[in-house]
Amino acid sequence: MMVMIDFKEIEKKWQKRWEEAKIFEANPDDREKFFITAAFPYLNGVLHAGHLRTFTIPEVVARFQRMKNKNVLWTFGYHVTGTPILGLAELIKNRDEKTIWAYTELHGIPKEELLELTTPEKIVEYFSKKAEEAFKRMGFSLDWRRNFKTDDKVFNKFIEWQFHKLKEKGLIVKGSHPVRYCPRCDNPVEDHDILVGENATLVEYILIKFTTEDGCIMPMATLRPETVFGVTNVWVNPEATYVKAKVYLEKETENGIELIENGIWIMAKECAEKLKHQDRKIEIIEEFKGEQLINKKVKNPVTGKEVPILPAKFVKTNIGTGCVMSVPAHAPYDYIALRDLGLVDEIGLIPLINVPGYGKYPAKEIVEKMGIKSQEEEDKLEEATKKIYKDEFHKGVLNENCLDYEGIPVREIKDKLTKDLIDKGLAEIMYEFSEEKVICRCGTPCIVKMVKGQWFIKYSDEKWKELAHKCIDKMRFIPENLRQVFHEKIDWMKDKACVRRRGLGTKFPFEEGWVIESLSDSTIYPAYYTVAKYINQHNIKPEQLTLELFDYVFLGKGDVDKIAKETGIPKDIIEGMRKEFIYYYPVDWRCSAKDLIPNHLTFYIFNHVAIFPEEFWPRGIVVNGYVTIEGKKLSKSKGPVLPVLEVAEKFGADVGRFYITTCAELPQDADIKFKEMENTKKVLERLYLFAKEIAERRGETGEEFSYIDKWLLSRLYKAVKQYDEYMENFELRKAGILLYQLLDDLKWYRRRGGNNIRVLEEFLEVIIKLMMPFTPHLCEEMWEILGKEGFVSLAKFPEVKEEFINDEIEKGEEYLKAVMEDIKEIINVAKVQPKRIYLYTADDWKYEILKIIKENEGKTIKELMPIIMKNPEFRKYGKEIPKLVNQLIKLNAEIINEVEVLENAKEFLKKEVGVEDIIINGEDKANKKRVAIPFKPAIYLE
């Protein structure tokens, strides 16, 4: 029966000792530094399973790098900027039922404690304590002297400095700009503020101004303006509500807003509502159903051609204008709709793009090829549309129907044509969300709003983008394919609203009444970690943190004596801050989940290259997948959540750490399964009991190394080598599998009769060090019971003893396992229990052929045969040889002394398969020896 081990007591004991000894406090010295950070948590709830994965990855790597004698800086701050915490305080104050349920049932907060959290300050204080408790309970090796919150007055001064630097470079600008906006909160919203659709971006629709017979403008919304050359008709939804409205453009002037007449428009009612928020004034003249427009004609402003208005129920009026161009030669939806109306021949198709691999009419071709019968087959139509659009974008070239644009590749036309159409007054821009639903945390549907007098960070600046691309080219990315993703994000980046009217955070230094928003104050804060310990320990006041001070500390500018005098901060402290920044910066690795790629991580690169010299630019980014629980997606409001403290309580910190970092490859999503966590716990319990057993045998005299001793040591040191490589590259799952394999090797060693205390002690000492980054509490406990000095958390990484690595012994043991399995299988099939077993190894000539195969690694059978047949000795075996070569390649046979391996393991094999005797290469029973091949002996039961 398994002895119960009190993991929690072990954890408490070592957490206390680490804290008392302050072993994770990092200070500059003469060692190589290693600075690793993770995106700090937002304090509107407890740390959960998603945080656990994202934060434990750098935690494990930080501990590993300490073993490699690096001076590791690893710490955390807390993000509280913006409106979510304000919103939560209001919901709790108003006793909102859904909120009370979510925070008591899912986040595990006692109701009486939750109901006290009625102000933002109380929420920040409560959840910062909960976060600290979670980090400590999980055994995180953090330097707590550097902790801060983003509403700390001292941190606000740092953010003010950041914004002054951006403004000096012309990267903070004021103007009108489209933003995601909540009408109820009366504020732009960022990812953190959004309940549904947090990944929604702004999409630029081009409104091409077709005109009706009575001179009204009918704007066609499109993402592909080049298709205007292939329009055969336009679609409206006959059942939807449309409006005729007077449209004015709103232009900002010194005297206020000037209205410029922009014609009478016909559009969907929803579109008119949206355009009111996008620099336009709308005066509705009349409302009517779309059916009233059917069979009327409109004029294409680009080609001059008149085309009919036709009905299509697939037209969505909640996106764009509710008026859609029909291009049936290239759009499967349009072709099918026209075919259903029986109008293909009458209206005709107009091709506009030549695409390799397609005929004149790609849409017609793909619809017929896929057998699409009607508009009801939406999945097939969607698939066909995506395929054509992809092929046209990457390989298509505009044809002669595109007038002056003939010969231009599709991928290059959009910006040029859009600019030309706008310059000629034939088109305008309208903004939509990339997702249908975008809902603020307050529950209100968001809109796209053109905000006037708004402050932006000018991420569209081309020179700034060049620097960001340069940085990306020099960085390391895990996984590597992120490099291209970041290049694309930089290219697509547009100006971004950086302030809002309410919320926690830093007051905007250039105009009163604004607060810097949450994705703008969370970009360069790792630099603040390097100096936060001085600010915290020396109780430096906000007013002492001047722009000149930060210029000196982070940029080396200014006179330190003058700054010391003006700020009242002693010169040695200022110089210490500067020294610490230079020593630890840049950040070696920035870790985050993949949801932060399009915002936080991209802004992290942008802001670093704008503010710091090149030597301090980021060196690497690591991104992990999401977390699900028993197949269910995490949700803070609906569940499941799985708080970190619950993991520590139910399973233990070490179990949680080891499981969450090794249950999935880094880029993959990790699905937490509680049964697997229980199994992890059992593995750790067995390891601990093994350590206790070895501790009790201390003082025993070891023996000379036997064959099986040498095998275990070879496996051990080969694993150390491999583990080192995996951990350097954040391949934690592979490192975890390696550790499980080592524990299996130990099991096999003991099954083979291995019991040499010298070997067992060495094995245990090494595996404790390898396990330590994952399971530090248990490893400290085992280290102590073995009588080792100091903390294993500070022990040196095991040295690889190359002299013990022996491929031949390892191959021999692999061979033995295979032979044993073959014998057991034959006994099982024969359904008899033999008294003795005859084993026959291959004839010598077969080994000669294996040698030729090994010397010509990678060659095919066809290439190997002439080489083998050069030797006249082999010719007599004729047809046997191709078959043998094929078998040896498939088996991946190795050259070893099979007889020696079998003789050494004879007693073991007899015991394992339950026979009286095993005879090796004895009397050839039933002519069996002829079927033996290298690495696969023939077997005869008697």
Swiss-Prot record:
A motif ('HIGH' region) lies at residues 41-51. It comes from the Archaea. Keywords: Aminoacyl-tRNA synthetase, ATP-binding, Cytoplasm, Ligase, Nucleotide-binding, Protein biosynthesis. It comes from Methanocaldococcus jannaschii (strain ATCC 43067 / DSM 2661 / JAL-1 / JCM 10045 / NBRC 100440) (Methanococcus jannaschii). One of its GO terms (molecular function) is ATP binding. It catalyses: tRNA(Leu) + L-leucine + ATP = L-leucyl-tRNA(Leu) + AMP + diphosphate. Transmembrane segments: none annotated. Its EC number is 6.1.1.4. GO terms for biological process: leucyl-tRNA aminoacylation. It is an enzyme of class 6 (ligase). It is found in: Cytoplasm. PANTHER family: LEUCINE--TRNA LIGASE, CYTOPLASMIC (PTHR45794:SF1), LEUCYL-TRNA SYNTHETASE (PTHR45794). A motif ('KMSKS' region) lies at residues 633-637. HAMAP family: Leu_tRNA_synth_A. It holds the Pfam family Anticodon_1. Belongs to the class-I aminoacyl-tRNA synthetase family. This is Leucine--tRNA ligase. InterPro entries: aa-tRNA-synth_I_CS (IPR001412), aa-tRNA-synth_Ia (IPR002300), Leu-tRNA-lgase_arc (IPR020791), Leu-tRNA-synth_Ia_arc/euk (IPR004493), M/V/L/I-tRNA-synth_anticd-bd (IPR013155), Rossmann-like_a/b/a_fold (IPR014729), tRNAsynth_Ia_anticodon-bd (IPR009080), Val/Leu/Ile-tRNA-synth_edit (IPR009008). One of its GO terms (cellular component) is cytoplasm. Its main location: cytoplasm. ATP binds at K636.
